[in-house]
């Protein structure tokens, strides 16, 4: 009698066979991705060819390490193991490693990461920083023993001696290189005495240069506060670091030239030209000042200083004339008054009154005489005082006595409060004048 197996028993048997079969423990398989829809964790899809289909699974940890994203219709080569899923009685391949078929995985990864970062805007020109014209200290992230650092040091020393080079010895290829490059870029940005950063290495295969295509390095360059020059490989080599850097140089020598756009010779030439321009400007200023001084010395005021007080002398003459006229008028008026009073007394005729009025008249006459004398003396003294005051205004008399007169913009300076530092003043002396600049102003404490 035949023995019938349960579905479970058969499935378990088949699973045991699959698990123990050495040919199914590590299977090398090629196929086309089908029914793929990217999930946040594990990836489930199908691998097919023209005649068959097999279910495939990639656990999330493995998928994150692939270095590229699966796409519908992509042909891939995978390594994995075949297993049976008992509840459905189906079998599938659990993929442990995968790479695109034909085109290398690195090329796919390059294009996919480039597309991703481009969409994020990391390569846009608006984020590029201008390189400094004069750098005091330049940081270099590269290998300690490579030709890169030697070429940079030689070129910078030739173009602008005195610029410091600070090397960050860095692993530039192989496992851990990308992390070390990113870490040293961040370290350089922590310093306040760096002006610029050069990252790079010499030529090599795409695998050798791959650290400069890693996302961690690209983002470190993008986040750099310091302007970054990328010099990776030869002129024909292109990395993602070149896209995100502020400038790309084909060689380390070219990078050093970009880092020192102005040479020491350029600076010396510029200084010499500036010196010539300043000398010409000084000569022009002196010429204009000398011409202005010549015009001033030829002015009427300097040639005929007495004209400064001509008006005051005329005023003095007028005052003296008015004073004399006033005195004569007053004397005449008083005489007329005396005559009128005398006439009144004569007309009244009483002897006593006449005598009294005569006495009174005599007193008034004396008083009038004394008052007129006082008034006259006062007017004469005032006229003398005004005359002396006018003479004091004569600058030629002042400087003739050994004094000097300070003038600012044609006005006489009578107080330090009207001056300030760097004011231009003229010192008038007996035998000429001196142009001065105020060095300091000190007010006398009272």
Curated annotation (Swiss-Prot):
Family annotation (InterPro entries): Exonuc_VII_L, Exonuc_VII_lsu_C, OB-fold_nuc-bd_dom
Subcellular location, record wording: Cytoplasm
UniProt EC number: 3.1.11.6
GO molecular function annotations of the record: exodeoxyribonuclease VII activity; nucleic acid binding
Principal subcellular localisation of the protein: cytoplasm
Signal peptide extent: none
Known catalytic reactions: Exonucleolytic cleavage in either 5'- to 3'- or 3'- to 5'-direction to yield nucleoside 5'-phosphates
GO BP: DNA catabolic process
Keyword Nuclease: yes
Cellular component, GO, one term: exodeoxyribonuclease VII complex
Keyword entries, A-Z: Cytoplasm, Exonuclease, Hydrolase, Nuclease
Subunit record text: Heterooligomer composed of large and small subunits.
PANTHER family on file: EXODEOXYRIBONUCLEASE 7 LARGE SUBUNIT
Family as reported in the entry's similarity comment: Belongs to the XseA family.
Biological role stated in the UniProt entry: Bidirectionally degrades single-stranded DNA into large acid-insoluble oligonucleotides, which are then degraded further into small acid-soluble oligonucleotides.
Protein name per UniProt: Exodeoxyribonuclease 7 large subunit
